Every structure is written in structure tokens, then in C-alpha cells.
């Protein structure tokens, strides 16, 4: 199999269009965009921002036992390649999931890309935080035992995020393929607000009409405003709980699949039906101290009651693990210099109504 298969055409799939693979060369052209909504594309003529995510990397998992092997470790079903028309290769699919430890706490968050390696054998690319690629590879090796599975880094492809230049258009704008040299272009499986994921050997802006190189700062600002955790800063290994981290909201857990490592606590919490704390997006209302806000800093109400803890952020936005019933009043953090920094928590409008 070629190290980077090429796009052929779009087919409808769960979560948006997906792209079929082919293995012979194609002329390098751009991808067109059009509206998904009846009212027309609100971003018509607007540029797409392409963010190169050097903090994300890929592991390749393949072999006859790859699917059952991963099913026993992940919180979600696998994104198996979609059925395709006669004579055409199956379409790639993406999914989101966490690896948990035996206590049921998150170790690593991953976006999975399901590929057809060859006849009736599926392979997977696991997108993970670059800083824990080696640790994740060792975690997989620990449980591999005698299964016919290979796990190896896949540096041939780079990870890009693609967003409309107008952030409010994320749920409406779409991309359509004409021809291209990208391996995978697919909607982010976590939420439509996070746009598209692009895995390619080429530069992302070269594949998108009006594409421009985005500032990574803007990507993380957008991500935090949408309440989407990503990587070990937002989801500390062995600390974060999957449902408190909104894994269910981001399509990252199945409560009907078979057993997996760490399932017991997650299933019990789900069936109790009450999740009292969640990761919420927060915005700081006061200037930040020069040293910034320390991860784990206590969030307090005006009366000094503890509401939760700051998790991570960038600039004046971030994520905090807060008691859901206490987020509406004035909140603040006592910074290391002794200053009191006001902040406000919000509920993303893409969350299920029942959670608001």
C-alpha cells in the first residue's frame, strides 16, 4: 500500500462527506467548497484557514487482529471503512475515543481514521498528542500479547485542521473534492464546530480554494471557546474522567459496545445519570498576571466557595473543571502574585439541550 493514498471522490457518510482512496497518482488540484444548507453558503468566497498541528502525530495500527485489538482498549466503536459502490474502494471514516487506565481515567485522547489496507482487512491511523506518541505505543504493546497487529509511527502524513475564516460558519460550510493529493479529508468527528481534519504530505493551504496558513494561536483559541479539550494539557493522563471531559458530547463513547479497559466506572457513571462536574470553556475578564494562570488553580465564587479547578488555556480563554450548578455567578481565581482574576464560564451552544 502506498504511504499516502490519494483522494478519489466524495460519498455521503455519518458525520459528513468522506473521501475514497485510490493508489495511483492524481493531478494536484484544489478542493472546492459549497454549502450544506438550503439557504446558501454564508462563507461563499471566504478563505479557509489551514492550521498545521505539529502537536499532533499519527500511529499506524494494522494487521488481521487490529480491529478486535483496539475494540478492547477504546471507549468507542471503530470507524470502519464505509461500503462503496461496485468497483470502488471503501471510503475512509473517522471517529473519536479515549484510552483509559484500569481505574477508568483518561490516558490518551485520539481521533481514529479507519482505512481499508487490502481485501477485507482494515487498518487504522491514530491521531494523538505528539508528546505521548511513545507512551501510547508502549501502552498498545502492553496489551498486544500474541495478536497479529503492528503498531508504528506514521510520519509520512501531517495533521491539519481546516476551518472557515468565519468561525460561526463552521457548522454550515463544507468542502467538496475535485481532485487532490491528500490522503484523508474528513469532518472532525467530535463536533461540526471543529471543521475538518486533513492528513496530507503536502501543505494544507495548497489543497483548499482560498486556503491560507492559519495562526495556531487562533486554532487553540477557537477550540477553547468551543469547549473542546485536546491533548495531555487539557486531559492529564490518569487524572481526567472521560464523562466529565464531555466525551459523550463529542461522540467519543459507546455504551452498547463490548468490554474495554476502564469501562466499569464510565458505565456506572452513565447509568447513574448524573454528572455533577464538567469541563467548561472559561474566559478571563481581567488582565492576566505575567506568570499566567497555573493549571489546577482553584476557581472560587464571590463568597470564596470552591467551584472547581482551572485545567489549561491560552491567552484569555481556557477550560476549567467546574460544578455545573455553580457556574452562573461571578467567579475568580487567586493568581500566584496574589491578584484576583475574574472569569466567566459558558455553555457551548452545540452541547445537547439537556446539559444547558
From Swiss-Prot:
GO terms for MF: RNA binding; transferase activity
Principal location listed in the UniProt entry: mitochondrion
InterPro entries given in the database record: TrmE/GcvT_dom1 (IPR027266), YgfZ/GcvT (IPR045179), YgfZ/GcvT_CS (IPR017703)
Mutagenesis / variant outcome for changing residue 259 to A: Abolishes the formation of the [2Fe-2S] ISCA2-IBA57 complex formation
Transit peptide, residue positions per record: 1-39
Modified residues (N6-acetyllysine): 309
GO cellular-component term (any): mitochondrion
Modified residues (N6-succinyllysine): 309
UniProt subcellular location: Mitochondrion
Free-text tissue specificity from the UniProt record: Expressed in skin fibroblasts and skeletal muscle (at protein level).
Keywords: Acetylation, Disease variant, Heme biosynthesis, Hereditary spastic paraplegia, Mitochondrion, Neurodegeneration, Primary mitochondrial disease, Transit peptide
GO terms (BP aspect): heme biosynthetic process; iron-sulfur cluster assembly
NCBIfam families, A to Z: ygfZ_signature (TIGR03317)
Function, as annotated: Mitochondrial protein involved in the maturation of mitochondrial [4Fe-4S]-proteins in the late stage of the iron-sulfur cluster assembly pathway. Operates in cooperation with ISCA2 in the maturation of [4Fe-4S] proteins.
Disease annotated for this entry: Multiple mitochondrial dysfunctions syndrome 3: A severe disorder of systemic energy metabolism, resulting in weakness, respiratory failure, lack of neurologic development, lactic acidosis, hyperglycinemia and early death. Some patients show failure to thrive, pulmonary hypertension, hypotonia and irritability. Biochemical features include severe combined deficiency of the 2-oxoacid dehydrogenases, defective lipoic acid synthesis and reduction in activity of mitochondrial respiratory chain complexes.
Similarity comment: family membership: Belongs to the GcvT family. CAF17/IBA57 subfamily.
Record note on quaternary structure: Monomer. Heterotetramer; forms a dimer of dimers with ISCA2. Interacts with [2Fe-2S]-ISCA2 forming the heterodimer [2Fe- 2S]-ISCA2-IBA57 complex; [2Fe-2S] cluster binding is absolutely required to promote the complex formation.
Protein's name in the database: Iron-sulfur cluster assembly factor IBA57, mitochondrial
Protein encoded by which gene: IBA57
Amino acid at each position: 500500500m502506498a504511504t499516502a493514498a490519494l483522494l478519489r471522490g466524495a460519498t455521503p457518510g455519518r458525520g459528513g462527506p468522506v473521501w475514497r482512496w485510490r493508489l495511483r497518482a492524481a493531478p494536484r488540484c484544489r478542493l472546492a467548497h459549497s454549502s450544506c444548507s438550503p439557504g446558501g453558503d454564508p462563507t461563499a468566497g471566504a478563505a479557509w484557514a489551514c492550521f498545521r498541528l505539529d502537536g499532533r502525530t499519527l500511529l499506524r495500527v494494522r494487521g488481521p487482529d487490529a480491529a478486535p485489538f483496539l475494540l478492547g482498549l477504546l471507549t468507542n466503536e471503530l470507524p470502519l471503512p464505509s461500503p462503496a459502490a461496485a468497483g470502488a474502494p471503501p471510503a475512509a471514516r473517522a471517529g473519536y475515543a479515549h484510552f483509559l487506565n484500569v481505574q477508568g481515567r483518561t490516558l490518551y485522547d485520539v481521533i481514529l481514521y479507519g482505512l481499508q489496507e487490502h481485501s477485507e482487512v482494515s487498518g487504522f491511523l491514530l491521531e494523538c498528542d505528539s508528546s505521548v506518541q511513545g507512551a501510547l505505543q508502549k501502552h498498545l504493546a502492553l496489551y498486544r500479547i500474541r495478536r497479529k497487529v503492528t503498531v508504528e509511527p506514521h510520519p509520512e502524513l501531517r495533521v491539519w485542521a481546516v476551518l472557515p475564516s468565519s468561525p460561526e460558519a463552521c457548522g454550515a460550510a463544507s468542502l467538496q473534492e475535485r481532485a487532490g493529493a491528500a490522503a484523508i479529508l474528513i469532518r472532525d468527528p467530535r463536533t461540526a464546530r471543529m471543521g475538518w481534519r486533513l492528513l496530507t504530505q503536502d501543505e494544507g493551504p495548497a489543497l483548499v480554494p482560498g486556503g491560507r496558513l492559519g495562526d495556531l494561536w487562533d486554532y487553540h483559541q477557537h477550540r477553547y471557546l468551543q469547549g473542546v479539550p485536546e491533548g495531555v494539557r487539557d486531559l492529564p493522563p490518569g487524572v481526567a474522567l472521560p464523562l466529565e471531559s464531555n466525551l459523550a458530547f463529542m461522540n467519543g463513547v459507546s455504551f452498547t459496545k463490548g468490554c474495554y479497559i476502564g469501562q466499569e466506572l464510565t458505565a456506572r457513571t452513565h447509568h447513574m445519570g448524573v454528572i455533577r462536574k464538567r469541563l467548561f470553556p472559561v474566559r478571563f475578564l481581567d488582565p492576566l498576571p505575567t506568570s499566567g494562570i497555573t493549571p489546577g488553580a482553584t476557581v472560587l465564587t464571590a463568597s470564596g466557595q470552591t467551584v472547581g479547578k482551572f485545567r489549561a488555556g491560552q491567552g484569555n480563554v481556557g477550560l476549567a473543571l467546574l460544578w455545573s450548578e455553580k457556574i452562573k455567578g461571578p467567579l475568580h481565581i487567586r493568581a500566584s502574585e496574589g491578584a484576583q482574576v475574574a472569569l466567566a464560564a459558558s455553555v457551548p451552544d452545540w452541547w445537547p439541550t439537556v446539559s444547558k
